Amino acid sequence: MDYNRMNSFLEYPLCNRGPSAYSAHSAHSAPTSFPPSSTQAVDSYASEGRYGGGLSSPAFQQNSGYPAQQPPSALGVPFPSSAPSGYAPAACSPSYGPSQYYPLGQSEGDGGYFHPTSYGAQLGGLSDGYGAGGAGPGPYPPQHPPYGNEQTASFAPAYADLLSEDKEAPCPSEPNTPTARTFDWMKVKRNPPKTGKVSEPGLGSPSGLRTNFTTRQLTELEKEFHFNKYLSRARRVEIAATLELNETQVKIWFQNRRMKQKKREREGGRVPPAPPGCPKEAAGDASDQSTCTSPEASPSSVTS
């Protein structure tokens, strides 16, 4: 008896079924799945008298790496064998079921075993592909993704970003777009055009136009300039209230009057002689339509 042949998984028949029972070539060539209509011929249990009735055609026997149907462990009876008469019939034992480590073309002493989980995807496909007459429910490991859960999860966000970039943003409908609201401060112009409206005599315009002084206002301003070239704020407020002007108008008139006096001193070097009874400053102010007053006149006196 050849024990090496008996112990080899690729050559040893299950339950003395014969040389053609499970003569598988290699477990690596197992296909992933078979349609239910791919099974052709089925071995009969009654005709050959061997265990494995309802098993599929040699297409499954040659591609499967180990038996696909677990023998019932409760039945410990021997089955009739069609092997040569020189061998005693062997009983089916639960130890030959597909739930253990199986040798791959080696003897027991070599220790060449492989775990069934390495072919989880192929075995799961075989169990789903065969019908009621094919492989029954066995202790097959669950299917696993080829790359693992970690790598599959890592691919998801990367491809999600690419898909989001390819998608174009939907165009908003025109009726739903809100109209731009115009506030009151938007309507006010920064630099409004100046109008040529002439202000009333003695009243300053808010737009900063030229102020037309009356003769009475010019006379009182010239009197004050004769005594004081520079005014304090209290005196400026008093003169503005007396002449019905604002404080800014009085301040600007005194600034212009000082610049005019300095210009005349630079150009002529001397001023023309003043008429008797009038100070020298009054002679240069003839163009300003100012009248001469006596030196004894009080600056605060107002003429009617």
Curated annotation (Swiss-Prot):
What Pfam families does this protein's entry cite? Homeodomain (PF00046)
* Claim: Metal-binding is one of the keywords in the record: no
Q: Which GO terms describe its cellular component?
A: nucleoplasm; nucleus
Looking at the keywords, is Nucleus present?
yes
* Disordered: region residues: 25-80, 130-151, 187-211, 257-304
- Put simply, this protein is called Homeobox protein Hox-B1
Q: Which InterPro entries match?
A: HD (IPR001356), HD_metazoa (IPR020479), Homeobox_CS (IPR017970), Homeodomain-like_sf (IPR009057), HXA1/B1/D1 (IPR046327)
For bias type Low complexity, the affected ranges are 25-39
